[in-house]
Amino acid sequence: MAREKFQTLTEPMFYILLCLRRERCGADIAAEVRTLTQERVCIGPGTLYNLLDSFLQAEMIRETKAEGRRRSYLITSKGQDALDEEYRRLLRLAEDYRTCKEGLQ
């Protein structure tokens, strides 16, 4: 059975949505992701703008302003729900790891 789109978020998806809890443009999103992850996750412009377009189509984010080529975005309630669900999924993953690791000791 195929999974629903955005049922599981990749790291770039997760961090983009996380950053969009505050209004930001693409360049600011990329910079914030690098800062937040201490350079561990770097999102290139191709990936960033493709994901922003997908999130817009899925109504997970909305465009808040456009000044020339610079566009700003903000997460929607649908995007926040997806972000919250991914956070819970990651917590379950970590709990499964801990349970298995403790069982092997």
Predicted features and spans:
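A positively charged, amphipathic N-terminal helix/segment that binds anionic biomolecules
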Residues: 1-2, 73
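Helical "lid/switch" subdomain of P-loop NTPase nucleotide-binding domains
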Residues: 47-48, 79
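Short, hydrophobic-biased segments on the C-terminal half of alpha helices
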Residues: 49-54
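Beta-hairpin "wing" of winged helix-turn-helix
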Residues: 56-68, 74
